[in-house]
């Protein structure tokens, strides 16, 4: 047999059939469900007189619309009636149909679906994982074939446990070398996107490999795969190694005893074979990656903290030049401004990209013994799940943040997107650990700069972006 990539192995092990035009029917192992993209799917099933084909594939939680404060008010704390209805509808639907696991609003295990799935052991190596959310690529950190689907596809998976798709091309992103102190997986992700652009991965499944990737924790690998979609890729992947196995073992839905041993024997094969051929290869030197900060309205508009805001006049492509000019106008920035001189109004540490325990530890290490700058109106930390929150509080991280003038919130998607009460006001500038800096993403007229948790925390203390490698 010819040498296979990890993507080849995952794809071929789930193909039910392939039509002459190349369209395949894929079996889906795990279906993650939240309140925003599931109501129409459940309603479609009811209208057709169907029920979910395999309810034990479903893991559900409320995350996008849930408030991160005023939990004492219960469901009434969700002020927007549409948001409240979506949360209530998810609750009614899942209680009626059943699921492998359901973590409703205010449950101790509730949180962002892409944090909850892995921490519960519901995401396992070798699985196909789908969710009505674009950042489902997160789960590829476990060598799972994971990608987002649309609302109609959510219904299709519920009804048939299968999905039609065409095989992507395979891209290898190899990152070799040791990262500098203060440089994280978020910086790798932004550096990759800065290199290949937001369309560079279109039509590909990206496998991340190399010594720098092997040196990442599972939290770091999830951050990296989470951002693969921002490079245009369908999926992000990291091969199984001992780090993967150590993370999964003992989690609530992970196999045990003899089943664990059998699973591990299979999982250890989830890596690209020696000599496997990729359709594209991108190589980065980890030692040269500096802390990254986005300056525009796309993740590809990113530079090192030591750089300046780019000048559109230096861009030869007229389309790109116009895009840069529009971005600078929206962001209220002037070409040539040092990134370290850009002041921020708000700081957000959270989202499915950077709200896990490692992320909070990194941010807390920066703010310990310091105080938020008076010029920063709000600095908020939103754990990715109730379990992350409990673990952080057991370590005293909440007290570190509160002592520094930060707000310590309840779990949820929060300020990643303007779909709940946490949002920017027009003109406000935010250092954010989320994944998208589009116009209006965090609130109409809001200006988003994507950074790592440590960089966000440092900006809150200084009142502007700083090089985390110097004095923090």
Swiss-Prot record:
Cross-referenced InterPro entries: 3-IsopropMal_deHydase_lsu, Acnase/IPM_dHydase_lsu_aba_1/3, Acoase/IPM_deHydtase_lsu_aba, Aconitase_4Fe-4S_BS, Aconitase_4Fe-4S_dom, IPM_dehydratase_rel_enz, IPMI_cat
Molecular function, one GO term: 4 iron, 4 sulfur cluster binding
Recorded metabolic or biological pathway in which this protein acts: Amino-acid biosynthesis; L-leucine biosynthesis; L-leucine from 3-methyl-2-oxobutanoate: step 2/4
Cofactor binding note of this UniProt entry: Binds 1 [4Fe-4S] cluster per subunit.
Keyword Lipid metabolism: no
Record-linked Gene3D superfamilies: Aconitase, domain 3 (3.30.499.10)
A Pfam family that the UniProt record links to this protein: Aconitase
E.C. numbers: 4.2.1.33
UniProt catalytic activity: (2R,3S)-3-isopropylmalate = (2S)-2-isopropylmalate
Cofactor dependency: [4Fe-4S] cluster
Annotated positions binding [4Fe-4S] cluster: 352, 413, 416
Keyword Phosphoprotein: no
Reported function: Catalyzes the isomerization between 2-isopropylmalate and 3-isopropylmalate, via the formation of 2-isopropylmaleate.
Family the entry assigns: Belongs to the aconitase/IPM isomerase family. LeuC type 1 subfamily.
Subunit comment: Heterodimer of LeuC and LeuD.
Name of this chain's protein: 3-isopropylmalate dehydratase large subunit
Organism field: Laribacter hongkongensis (strain HLHK9)
């Amino acid at each position: 047999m010819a040498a296979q990539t990890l993507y080849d192995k995952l794809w071929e092990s789930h193909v039910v059939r392939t039509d002459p035009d190349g369209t395949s029917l894929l079996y889906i192992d795990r279906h993650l469900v939240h309140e925003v993209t599931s109501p129409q799917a459940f309603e479609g099933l009811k209208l057709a007189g169907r029920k979910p084909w395999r309810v034990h594939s479903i893991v559900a939680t409320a995350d996008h619309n849930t408030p991160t404060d005023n939990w004492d008010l219960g469901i009434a704390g969700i002020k927007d009636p549409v948001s409240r209805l979506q949360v209530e509808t998810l609750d009614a639907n899942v209680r009626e149909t059943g699921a492998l696991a359901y973590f409703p609003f205010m449950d101790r295990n509730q949180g962002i679906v892409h944090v909850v799935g892995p921490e519960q052991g519901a995401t396992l190596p070798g699985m196909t994982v789908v969710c009505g959310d674009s950042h489902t690529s997160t789960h590829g950190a476990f060598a799972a074939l994971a990608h987002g689907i649309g609302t109609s596809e959510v219904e299709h998976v519920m009804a048939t446990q299968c999905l039609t798709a065409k095989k992507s091309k395979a891209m290898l992103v190899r990152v070799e070398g040791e990262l500098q102190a203060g440089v994280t997986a978020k910086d790798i992700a932004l550096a990759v996107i800065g290199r290949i652009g937001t369309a560079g991965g279109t039509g590909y499944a990206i496998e991340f490999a190399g010594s720098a990737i092997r040196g990442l924790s599972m939290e770091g690998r999830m951050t990296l795969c989470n951002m693969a979609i921002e490079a245009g890729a369908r999926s992000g992947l990291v091969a199984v190694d001992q780090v993967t196995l150590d993370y999964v073992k003992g989690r609530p839905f992970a196999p045990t005893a003899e089943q664990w041993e059998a699973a591990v024997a299979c999982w250890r094969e989830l890596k690209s074979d020696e000599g496997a051929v990729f359709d594209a290869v991108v190589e980065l030197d980890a030692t040269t990656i500096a802390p990254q900060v986005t300056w525009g309205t796309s993740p590809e508009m990113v530079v090192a903290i030591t750089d300046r805001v780019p000048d559109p006049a230096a861009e030869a492509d007229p389309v790109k030049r116009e895009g840069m000019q529009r971005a600078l106008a929206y962001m209220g920035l002037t070409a040539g401004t040092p990134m370290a001189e850009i002041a921020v109004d708000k700081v957000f540490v959270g989202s499915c990209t950077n709200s896990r325990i490692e992320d909070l530890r990194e941010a807390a290490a920066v703010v310990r013994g310091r105080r938020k700058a008076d010029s920063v109106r709000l600095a908020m930390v939103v754990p990715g799940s109730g379990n992350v929150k409990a673990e952080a509080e057991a370590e005293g991280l909440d007290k570190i943040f509160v002592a520094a003038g930060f707000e310590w919130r309840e779990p949820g998607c929060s300020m990643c997107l303007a779909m709940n009460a946490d949002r920017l006001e027009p003109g406000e500038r935010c250092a954010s650990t989320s994944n998208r800096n589009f116009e209006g993403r965090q609130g109409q007229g809001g200006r988003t700069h994507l950074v790592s948790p440590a960089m966000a925390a440092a900006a809150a203390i200084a009142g502007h972006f700083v090089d985390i490698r110097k004095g923090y």
